[in-house]
Each structure stands twice: as structure tokens, then as C-alpha cells.
Amino acid sequence: METILEQQRRYHEEKERLMDVMAKEMLTKKSTLRDQINSDHRTRAMQDRYMEVSGNLRDLYDDKDGLRKEELNAISGPNEFAEFYNRLKQIKEFHRKHPNEICVPMSVEFEELLKARENPSEEAQNLVEFTDEEGYGRYLDLHDCYLKYINLKASEKLDYITYLSIFDQLFDIPKERKNAEYKRYLEMLLEYLQDYTDRVKPLQDQNELFGKIQTDFEKKWDNGTFPGWPKETSSALTHAGAHLDLSAFSSWEELASLGLDRLKSALLALGLKCGGTLEERAQRLFSTKGKSLESLDTSLFAKNPKSKGTKRDTERNKDIAFLEAQIYEYVEILGEQRQLTHENVQRKQARTGEEREEEEEEQISESESEDEENEIIYNPKNLPLGWDGKPIPYWLYKLHGLNINYNCEICGNYTYRGPKAFQRHFAEWRHAHGMRCLGIPNTAHFANVTQIEDAVSLWAKLKLQKASERWQPDTEEEYEDSSGNVVNKKTYEDLKRQGLL
């Protein structure tokens, strides 16, 4: 039986070896998406084991049962040599009884892990289960969610490719359609997105993500800024949809002038008691001014279950909105897969059956070639890689001017290799964003301008030029006097003031 100190030593060794293997795993170059996903899952498994070992170590150091303290006292007391020989005797006795006992060092186990990573078996190459439609983490498979969506009551009938474009635009759906069936659809969609994220991005801490989403949602919900769920007005009447606006009344006496019938209809719209004299009804109705239904005294309501129902509806709406908030976040995380899915579906719909079969055969052959062992490419001059994954020829590298670097200060000192990439970047998002930050339009006037100072000075010059070319009504607008003489506006006004016309 291992001693407490030996268990602690073994746990410390395992932690260090796990850290070393995780570092090597993360530094290993992944050439395909399959390799990246499998590597992330191996890393997460080691992280989970690391946390488990750390928890065991903490329990041993806490020493709630006092065994560690007893062992320390035994080996550090006055009879330490007697204790040493006693334990040595126990070890010899154990090996005498079990002469063929095999002990596998921990280093051997981790060496086997490294070998399995370098020469993976067929099972190790498919660590995660994906459907054929998902293409091992490349695409989304939302067909079940799509069928659930188009079967919702009063839902718009659309095709699958359109659904892929708008399935996250939940804020456009009217609140009247967000019922229990709609909530079940959201739960189904969210469950798939969470499961897919867990398979494609296993290192994503979903517990931390949930806390972040919840904090942001609570803040937006309280402020009334959450998309699709605007904050209700402060008046209790407008909150309940009544047609009487209390903002025009400053006292209950003014409300009393409306009469018994009008006050009764307004109180009924709120679910309040509508009996009593004219003064009592007016005072009861005026007491709701500037208040929400939840803040009113329950004794004012005709039936308490109605107020509970209103509060229940608010909680139900908040639950639905929180589901939407989670879906928004996961869709943003899976933005790349969503775009690839849209392109893949669009491409499949435009192809014939024979072309689809050929594409599937190509994908199978590509996956088989990806699974082959990748050799280390010799690339001492750091040349760009071609379509085959190998460095392009040096003469082609020189021909395209890829040895020339162009720096653009507007793009945040980003470096572009080759004149072609440099010229193309003026129309791309990075340069356009830099120009927008400077408050300058990205027009043809600023082609080949890479310095911020040059762009600002050119923009000032262009503004002056445009100002000088702008039409000046005082000097360019022409008038005709009574004698038929044509003069500009300024001269005409001067002559008119002097009475010379």
C-alpha cells in the first residue's frame, strides 16, 4: 500500500508530465481541421485529468483524517531508523510473495501517449462523432431545427438555405408568436449549438460563457435594451394597453370629470376594482399614474390571480429572451462554420446528381490523403506554400515580387508581401477601417497613400478644393434689373436697398 507522501509525490509527477504533454500537443502543427479538433479533445482530456489530480492533492494536503500528520511524525520521530527498516521489510515481503509483479513507470504511459499521437489508429483519428452533413466539424446540420421552425404556428415558409441566413434573427419575430411551442424550438436549437460547440471547440469553457451571457443579459433586460424585447412604458395603463393616458391629468379631481363609465372602462382594462363612488374610482385610477402593474398594491386588483398571471408572463418572457441571448452568443462563436454551411448548401443545390457523387468521392480521397503521415517540409527561405502544401519555386517567388514588403501605417503598420497584395489591400476591410477611424472616405483620391500624415493633409486639401468649387449664390446667382441689365445677387441687393432699381 502506498504511503500518503508517495501518493503526493506521484500526483506531483503526474501534474508535471501532463503539463509537458499538453505543451507539446499545443505546439504540434495541425495541417487539417480533423487534426485540430482531435488535438483539442486530447488537450481537454488532459486538462480534466490535471484538475482531478490537483483536487486529490488538495485533499491530501488538507489531511482531514490526520493520516499525513501521523506519517510525518513516524518518519521524523526518534525511531526514524526503526521505521525505515520496518518499511523496507514490508517491501521485501511484498516482492517475495509477488515475484512476477510488473510495475509500469509513469514515464512509459506518457511515452505511449506521444506515440499514439504520432501514429494514430483509425479509432484515434475519429475521436468525435459527427454526422455526414457536418463533415467532421466543418459544417452545421440544422435540418431538424429547420423542420421544427417551419412547423411553428404562423411561421414563414422558407427554404433551408434562407433559414441558414435568418435563423438567428429572433428579434424580428413578433412577441405574440413567442409561445410555448416557440420556446421548445429555441431549446432544441440551443441544445444543438451547445453540443456542436462542445464537439468542435472542446477548449471553450461553456460554464464561463454561460456566466458572461447571463450577466450581459440581466443588464440589457433591466435597461430594456435587449433586442426584440423593448422596455415597457412606466405608466401602468399603457403597460396594460388601456386607452386612457394619465399624463394629461394632474389630480384625481380632473379624472372625476370623465364620468363613471369612462373611469370604469379604464379600471377594467387594468384589472382593478371598478366599483365605488365617482371620487373613489378617480382616486384609485390616479394612484396608478407612473407605476407598473407589479408595483401596485394587490388589494387594488379585482382578482389577485390576474396580477400573478401578469408576473408569470413576465418571467416566461424573460426565460425566452435568455434562450435567445444564448443562441446569439453561440451563433457568433460558430460564425465560420455557419458561413461555410451556407456556401456548401448553395453549391450542392446548384449541382447535378453526378456532380454531387464526384464531389463526395473527392472528399473521401482528400480525407484519406489527410490521414497519411505528414512529412516535415524543407523550407529554409520561408517561401509561401502552394496549393499542394509545398513551397512555391524561388523564381516564381521573385517573379511576383513576394520578396518585397510594403508597410501601411493606416492599416496599423501591417506588412503586405508583393505589389499585387499591396494594391489589392486598398479596397479591403483593414484599410477601409483605418480610413474610417481617421474620418476620411476611402475614395480613389487616396490610392497608394499609406501614411496617416499624408492622408490627413490630402483630405484637408481636397476639402478646400471642394469648398472653392462649391456654388456661391452671392456672386454666381444672376438677377435682371428693370433695364434688362444682368447683375449678380449681391449687386442686385445693394441696388435694391439704395432704391436705384
UniProtKB/Swiss-Prot annotation:
Phosphoserine: modified positions: 54, 121, 295, 299, 365, 367, 369
Phosphothreonine modified-residue sites: 475
Record keyword Zinc-finger present: yes
Comp. bias regions, Acidic residues: 355-374
N-acetylmethionine PTM sites in chain numbering: 1
Zn finger (Matrin-type) location: 406-437
PANTHER family membership: SPLICING FACTOR SF3A-RELATED (PTHR12786), SPLICING REGULATOR SDE2 (PTHR12786:SF1)
Protein name from the UniProt record: Splicing factor 3A subunit 3
Name of the coding gene: Sf3a3
